[in-house]
Amino acid sequence: MPAASLRALLAHSIDYAGMFPPCNLALEPALQNHAKYIRESDAWMLSNFILPTGQFAAVSGTLAQFDRKHPLRVSALGSKTETVAAFRPAFEEAFEAIRKFSTEHTGVVSIDQFEMLLPGDVDLAILAEAAGMFGEMKLHVFWETPADTAERAIALLAQHNSKKNVRVLGYKLRTGGVTADAFPSAAHVGGALIAAARNRVPIKFTAGLHHPVRQFRDEVKTKMHGFLNVLGAGVLAAEHDWDEGQISRMLEDENADSFSFDETIFAWREWEIATDRIHARRKLITSFGSCSFDEPREDLQP
């Protein structure tokens, strides 16, 4: 059994994105994998199944492997748009698909999350309009922008969240891909984590976090961020009010011995956070999308 502090840091942390690069599975085998994973002993690490809203209709005939005890928990992914003019109808289409799909499969499918790329010209009014459309739906909403605009986007989301009686909006940071240029610098990742912590904006991540600790990988010809680095830096930075230099040092650490977990404490070097505080900080440091559920958990094995 993993140490309590490790369980706190990684509980429901992996959104399974099997249909996306580099795995690129077809819908049916990806769903079969997810149905298997939610019945395994490591299911405590698993969160949602990333599913584009355009694939909802195709899923309807492949739900026999899910039931009320083992529902398909979905993070719905909206389509990519370049401008607000294109974003508004794309979002409305995604919203209608979510409403319809949820109604048709009550008890077997639970749409817990929505993710979508924001166009560069989005403003506060558009965010409020989009957030308001979800009404009473109980789902978490995350908006993605390029990593070099993360801090500005998080500030905009915080401005929205500061208003009374509004849906809290989160930020989605892309942390990698299949080519070297898809990986943001430690400074960009750290800046986003600090901005999210200081503004109390929920943050999730996607891509490039297959391995626990930062390392060079031949398949992408660059260093990949580690999920222990990123999630760990997120909770420690929030707990200790780190600056950009301190958080970059943790994000760039490639020594697995720097990380230690026991029943009461997670530590990175001399910095510590108690297990109960990890639970509290994880309300804002939420999850990461990965096309593999096997790689992250296998790499954690001693």
For the regions a language model picked out, list residue spans one by one.
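General "foldedness" signal
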Residues: 63, 88, 128, 155-157, ...
